Amino acid sequence: MKTKAGNYLVSSRHLALLTLIDGTDGHPIWILGSKRNEFKDLSDGRATDFSWQHHARFYQNESHITMFDNHGEHTGTCRETCLSRGLHLEIDEQEMTVRVVKEYFHPDRVDAGAMGGFQSLPSGNVMTAWGHTPAFVEFTYDGTPVMDVQRGKIGGGTQNDMFAYRVHKSDWKGRPTWAPSLALEAPDKNTNNAKLWVSWNGATDIAKWAVVC
């Protein structure tokens, strides 16, 4: 991800770290996570204990980072120590500190060995995609699931063909390119007692029709 200053946030999932790379000469400005971590963890180690992560992004004026922390290579139900999570961090580049703002765990306590995504929504909710665990979950900001969708068998791993690599939620307005369809029932062969049905399949913002004769 490119920053406003022209630098780059680079996620190295096999090294379990994030690096901010200078966009001019390519040197690392700082490293977050793994053995070369340069930040003081204010959350008892939970802020820097991520691995195999995906979809790392700056958030809120680049003082926050969100990501999907796979936290291991196992896929399926898991123990507390290896649960995948949606992770929201706050960083202070002056004090070189990092803390956990929020963690989002799957309601069924699962792990995703690969893939995954994290999207911060305008409402404050969070959409998480669970990669090799074929599911996606929307949470409120405080961590309450409000939508939990499972697209396949949990624990199928790489044999599962219903991965959820990324899931994005957005407002969508359907406006078909074709004209509405009309059906008229006129038992008296005139407008008396006649009924008119209108359908515009795909339109999302039609509340009522005004028929002008």
Describe these PLM feature segments.
Residues M1-C213:
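Histidine-/acidic-rich catalytic cores in large beta-rich domains
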